[in-house]
Amino acid sequence: MKKTQTWIITCIYLQLLLFNPLVKTKGICENRVTDDVKDVTKLVANLPKDYKITLKYVPGMDVLPSHCWISEMVQHLSVSLTDLLEKFSNISEGLSNYSIIDKLVKIVDDLVECMEEHSSENVKKSYKSQESRLFTPEEFFRIFNRSIDAFKDLEMVVSKTSECVVSSTLSPEKDSRVSVTKPFMLPPVAASSLRNDSSSSNRKASNFTGDSNLQWAAMALPAFFSLVIGFAFGALYWKKKQPNLTRAVENIQINEEDNEISMLQEKEREFQEV
């Protein structure tokens, strides 16, 4: 019985080990994003609508995969948020804004550190010159939310050379996400702020279709092989134990027959004595 339990436990641990790729986190830096991003809504409401925030915008955010621009964009966001933080540091009535911005700076700095740890040398980038532009709070934090959303889906599986080239006809002014004039609506999760921009969402979905298919294939293959290996181990174990079980059953039957014969012989002797 103990050997049987040992084999069962071994098979369970083997299955868990082989299924490990399925339970890993999808975003490599997702754990760096805290619930403090929910305070962006409050911050945007507190800032004047005509207030301008300087930011170096990376062209191609809506036409290239996220791994092409996220590393550059998060560094520029860190610089802009740090500059914004300094402007509120000495204003007593702006302590609430200061606290929110300070938390956002820490999140972005953690993301910068995470990207440096997972940087890929195989990505060939060819960006146009990045010029500093002025954005309203609504526009700036829409870009911020887009970047945070990208981190939740980002997975560095760039094993082969990947070219990130922005078309020469694309300019920041033509980027619909920057120039959008729709009402600013931020839900508890920053990713939902992009739903009203249907054209950008469609482009994003088409860009990631190929990558998502590859990711599903990469997860499905280990799962399939783990099932095959698990069934193979189970079959081998059953085949190994089957002769022993057969012999055990035969021995039990023989013992029962011997006992019956013994009882009959004993009764026969008692009857003869009587």
From Swiss-Prot:
The chain crosses the membrane at residues 216-238. It is a single-pass type I membrane protein. Pfam families: SCF (PF02404). Residues 239-274 are cytoplasmic. It is found in: Cytoplasm; Cytoplasm, Cytoskeleton; Cell membrane; Cell projection, Lamellipodium. Its main location: cytoplasm. Residues 26-215 are extracellular. InterPro entries: 4_helix_cytokine-like_core (IPR009079), SCF (IPR003452). A soluble form is produced by proteolytic processing of the extracellular domain. GO terms for molecular function: cytokine activity; growth factor activity; stem cell factor receptor binding. Stimulates the proliferation of mast cells. Able to augment the proliferation of both myeloid and lymphoid hematopoietic progenitors in bone marrow culture. Also mediates cell-cell adhesion. Acts synergistically with other cytokines, probably interleukins. Homodimer, non-covalently linked. This is Kit ligand. It comes from Equus caballus.
